Every structure is written in structure tokens, then in C-alpha cells.
Amino acid sequence: MASRNMNNVFVYCEIEGTQVQEVSQELLTKGRKLANELGVDLNAIVAGTGIKGKVEEQILPYGVDKLFVFDGEGLFPYTSAPHTDILVNLFKEEKPQICLMGATVIGRDLGPRVSSSLTSGLTADCTELEIGPYEDKKNQKTYDNLLYQIRQIGRASCRERVF
């Protein structure tokens, strides 16, 4: 398990009532793979009303090292402001390297808000995300970085934090 503030991989889990959505389960699987490749922890976030004790068994089996559960009035159904505040405050403290969100109505609303608030990178509509080599010829160094496949655009790479 990685130590605190090691730029872990995070997955934002979408829920409907107390049911974790399939897109989040898929992202947890990919998140575990990326975390293993990077040698960091996989953390998951879920926010809703009346969810504590009802969502953990749906999320933890995916190899999540730490689960952040935010349970309170006004967190379900989803609205932008409280969920953005939760993620921005958490990410300021935890400093994730990557946060995966679904390409859903919620993910497309929340991702840009969090990214803008933190002035971080945002890569939308990825169909593939992997760790690969990046050669900085100017500084004669090679880094492991993110390679991602975007619908209809092709392949690109990024060395900065991506949400």
C-alpha cells in the first residue's frame, strides 16, 4: 500500500439510490490496473444519502485500498455544487494523480467543474488509458506517463495530473 499523498488513483463512483452503477464498476477495474502499474493505491469516492453500510460491499471487492463515503442529506439525487465541493476539498488534501469518472451526464458535469476549480488537466471521452514511456529529448530523460485513446481523435500523452 502506498503512503499518504503519493498521487494515488481515484475513481468517482456513481450511484442510483444505493446501487453502484455499472460504469463505476468498469472504472474500478481499470483503476486497479493503473494503480498497480503506477505502484500506488486505488481510492474510491461515493456520495449520496443513506448509503453508508450499503455501498461498501459493491465497491471494495474491486481491490479498493481506501473508500471515501460521503453520506448526507442533499447528496442524492446528484447536484453539481455539493459533489464538486466534496471532490475539490478531498483532492486538495489527497492530491490524486488520476481521477476516473464515467463519460455520463454526471461525469461530464462534475469532471470539468473539479478540473477547473483545481486548475488541473482534463481528458474527456477516453476509450483507453494506459501507462507508457515518454522520452523528453531536451532533458534526456524517460518518464512513465499516461497514454490515452480519445474517440475520433487518436492517441495523445500527458505527464501532468489528469481528471
Segments from the language model and where they lie:
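N-terminal glycine-rich FAD/FM-binding segment characteristic of electron-transfer flavoproteins
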Residues: 1-161
